[in-house]
Design a protein with these regions (language model features):
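Intrinsically disordered, low-complexity terminal segments enriched in Ser/Thr
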Residues: 1-5, 9
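Intrinsic-disorder/low-complexity loop/linker signature
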Residues: 9-10, 59
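Compositionally biased, low-complexity segments
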Residues: 12-14
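C-terminal beta-sandwich interaction modules and adjacent acidic
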Residues: 17-401
Length: 401
């Protein structure tokens, strides 16, 4: 048995987890079609990419067969890149490209009934005899949910990668000539997300020696990060070592965090945007040294006006943050949006009497992994969803004065 204590500003909740057969659902996500014939049920909307596997997307579709008139019911899971507004679909222009899609016929059912997950068992108890469970297994080379931040004057839905579970009534699963009316569909948007690895490795280190005109010896620069992965909202510590053997003067140090967004669709295009830049007035004279740590903090709140910046996908009006680094196995091609970060340490060196002719910058770059930690509550949900924890007891809250 595990005991968890969750604290917020209003109460302390003691959560006890055990192994058992009874199952208790905290929340169910439901969407019903306009005609009321079908309803889509999911137990969660965030599905975790564990690099070597992805959470199974499992749910239930409720079907009222009395008004189908011989039609069938299907459900699909689609990963798509949206690069335009839905409003343009009315004139025959679709600005949405499916990266991956899978369809399942739900009614009439085909084949034998598969083993239900604990989540589906709970949903079936809620839905009743008209429920039909479904499961999708996403491949590991799909991108995560990422949106491209619109500009201050942009309207409509943001561009980016999204995931959609959709149930619909039709004669065929995928017929371009068949018109499926909106009242015959219901859909729920979900997210595919990644969390920071449990084991944080040592950070990157880079060094360079650079010579200058009118100077016999170089400037040595070494920069390193304390750790490989930093969490959103945490300060990033950059350790800098400088040995100025030249006759030049280092006027100041500039540290920048850049976001690299690689959009892979018909071609591969990379967009680089600074998300944090700080200048430090450290002067290192000729034949002097410096060893010091500096802190910077990239935040979305300081980049709200930057159009095209990658942010983590969100549902409805939830708060979000800068897009997390995309982790992959490296041996599979990935389409969509791939996000990475780097830290640039730049020494601004004075040119002396000849100005820019004899002065130059000294720069090193460090790869940075920027992600969110896995919340304890998500860990509990994952264990529950996988069947490793099959009931949850919430003890009445202890009020805090």
């Amino acid at each position: 048995m595990y005991i968890y204590i969750v604290v917020n500003k209003n109460a302390i909740y003691i959560i006890s987890l055990s192994i058992g057969r009874n199952l208790k659902m905290a929340k169910v996500f439901k969407k019903t079609s306009g005609n009321g014939q079908i309803a889509l049920y999911l137990g969660k909307r965030d599905f975790v990419d564990h690099i070597d596997s992805v959470d199974v997307v499992d749910g239930v579709v409720k079907v009222d067969p009395s008004a189908l008139n011989g039609k069938k019911v299907f459900v699909y899971l689609a990963c798509a890149f949206r690069y335009g507004s839905d409003d343009l679909d009315v004139i025959g222009l679709s600005f949405r490209r499916d990266i991956w899609i899978q369809r399942i016929q739900m009614y009439p059912p085909t084949g034998g009934s598969a083993t239900q997950t604990p989540m589906q068992e709970s949903l079936m108890k809620k839905v009743g005899e008209q429920g039909y469970p479904f499961s999708f297994q996403m491949p590991t080379n799909l991108p995560c949910s990422v949106s491209l931040q619109p500009g201050p004057n942009d309207a409509g839905k943001a561009c980016g990668v999204d995931f959609e579970v959709k149930a619909y009534v039709a004669n065929e699963a995928d017929n371009a000539d068949e018109v499926i009316e909106k009242k015959d569909t219901c859909r729920l948007m979900i997210r595919k997300i990644q969390y920071a690895p449990a084991n944080n490795k040592a950070g990157a280190k880079a060094e360079i020696s650079k010579g200058f005109m009118m100077s016999d010896k170089p400037v040595h620069l070494e920069a390193s990060l304390e750790k490989e992965t930093y969490y959103h909202g945490d300060p990033i510590t950059v350790k800098v070592k400088i040995n100025n053997e030249s006759s030049k003067v280092v006027k100041k140090i500039k540290i920048t965090v850049e976001q690299l967004t690689n959009v892979v669709l018909y071609s591969s295009d990379t967009y680089i945007k600074p998300v944090c830049s700080e200048e430090f007035g450290e002067t290192i004279n000729a034949n002097a040294t410096l060893e010091k740590s500096f802190q910077i903090m990239p935040l979305l709140s300081n980049n709200k006006e930057k159009r095209g910046l990658s942010v983590d996908g969100r549902l409805k009006d939830e708060d979000t943050h800068l897009a997390s680094t995309t982790l992959s196995q490296g041996d599979k091609e990935m389409q969509g949006i791939i996000v990475s970060y780097k830290v640039k340490v730049n020494l601004m060196v004075a040119g002396g009497l000849l100005g820019g002719l004899t002065g130059s910058d000294v720069t090193v770059e460090l790869p940075l992994c920027l992600m969110s930690p896995k919340p304890a509550a998500n860990w509990i949900k994952d264990q529950f969803h996988r069947g490793e924890v099959t009931w949850v007891v919430f003890i009445d809250p202890i009020k805090v004065n």
